[in-house]
């Protein structure tokens, strides 16, 4: 059984931003699973009234929400990461998630084959934005750099 590295992505996360962290912890023979929320490009609504245009827009929306289209978009989203990690012997997969990302990560962790979870630290992003705004006013001060990524041991979740 291959050791898995889970990378749950939120709506606005870029896989390329997490690539250096995954490269650092992954070893050849491991498998990285990028968990992308469904729908990949966010929600869309129809703005047309009842008419022929509304029917045409409904068809476009139906094709926009198809699972295959979103899976293709998710694969295109992480294509640069796949290329970089495949060169190092790390297998990469896409898991398109329609439900709770937290529950999906917990389900993977319960199975026992997850080695590590790489995710963005929400509080880290907030602190980094705060320090960026303060540092713009006080450029002469040296500010500490916080890592905005957390590495989580899955045994702490179960």
For each predicted feature, which ranges?
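Structural alpha-beta junctions
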Residues: 28-31, 88-91, 141-150
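General small-molecule cofactor/ligand-binding pocket signal
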Residues: 33-35, 93-97, 150-152
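A short acidic, glycine-rich active-site loop
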Residues: 56-74
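Structural beta-alpha unit
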Residues: 83-116, 156-158
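Gly/Ser-rich helix-loop-strand patches that form or flank binding pockets
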Residues: 107-158
């Amino acid at each position: 059984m291959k050791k898995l590295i889970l990378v749950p992505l939120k709506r606005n996360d870029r896989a390329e931003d997490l690539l250096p962290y995954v490269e650092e912890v992954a070893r050849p023979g491991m498998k990285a699973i990028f968990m992308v929320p469904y729908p990949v490009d966010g929600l869309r609504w129809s703005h047309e009234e009842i008419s022929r245009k509304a029917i045409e827009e409904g068809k476009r929306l139906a094709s926009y929400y198809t699972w295959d289209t979103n899976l293709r978009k998710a694969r295109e989203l992480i294509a640069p990461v796949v290329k970089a990690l495949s060169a190092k012997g790390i297998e990469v997969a896409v898991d398109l998630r329609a439900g709770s990302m937290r529950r999906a990560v917990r389900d993977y962790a319960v199975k026992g084959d997850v080695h590590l979870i790489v995710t963005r630290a929400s509080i880290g992003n907030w602190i980094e934005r705060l320090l960026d705004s303060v540092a713009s006013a006080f450029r002469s001060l040296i500010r500490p750099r916080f890592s905005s990524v957390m590495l989580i041991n899955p045994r702490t979740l179960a």
